[in-house]
C-alpha cells in the first residue's frame, strides 16, 4: 500500500534508454506474469479496503477511482497469453458505468477514471525502452469491450 501512495510522487525511473515502472522492483526482474498478476490482484484488493473507508465530516477526501467504485464491482486479473495481462471489470452497475448521449451509450467518466487508475497500477510493473521490449502488454476490459489497450 505504501508503494501505491508513494507512487504519486515517485513515478517511473529512467536508466539511459529504459523506463521502469514504480513497482517494477517489487516482483524482481525475472518474475513471471502470474507473479505480476498476483501482485496486481493484491494491490486492487488493498486499494478497495483502504481507500473505500468514508471520511469524517469536515475532513478532505482524496478521490480514488478504485476506492470510490461501487462495492459490487469485481475484478479479474488474467494472463491469457505469454506476454499479456488482462484486467476485466465485472458487475458494473449500468447507471454508474454508462451514460446515454443522444441515444448512444458511452462509457461514463467514472468508469473511464477507474480503467485509467487500473492501467496505471498495472503499468507500474512494466518496463520498456529503445533496445528492450515491453515486459508485457496490458488491457483493461469491461464485458466484451476493451477500454484501454
Stretch-by-stretch model annotation:
Residues 1-149:
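Intrinsic low-complexity, intrinsically disordered or marginally ordered coil/linker segments
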Amino acid at each position: 500500500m505504501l508503494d501505491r501512495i508513494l507512487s504519486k510522487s515517485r513515478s517511473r525511473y529512467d536508466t539511459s534508454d529504459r523506463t521502469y515502472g514504480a513497482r517494477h522492483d517489487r516482483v524482481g526482474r525475472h518474475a513471471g506474469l502470474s507473479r505480476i498478476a498476483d501482485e496486481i490482484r493484491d494491490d486492487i484488493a488493498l486499494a478497495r479496503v483502504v481507500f473505500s473507508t468514508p471520511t469524517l465530516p469536515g475532513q478532505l477526501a482524496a478521490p480514488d477511482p478504485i476506492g470510490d467504485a461501487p462495492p459490487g464491482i469485481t475484478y479479474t486479473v488474467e494472463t491469457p497469453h505469454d506476454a499479456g495481462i488482462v484486467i476485466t471489470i465485472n458487475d458494473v452497475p449500468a447507471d454508474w458505468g454508462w451514460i446515454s448521449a443522444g441515444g448512444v451509450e458511452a462509457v461514463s467518466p467514472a468508469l473511464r477514471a477507474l480503467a485509467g487508475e487500473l492501467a496505471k497500477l498495472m503499468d507500474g510493473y512494466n518496463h520498456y525502452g529503445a533496445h528492450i521490449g515491453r515486459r508485457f502488454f496490458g488491457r483493461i476490459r469491461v464485458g466484451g469491450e476493451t477500454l484501454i489497450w
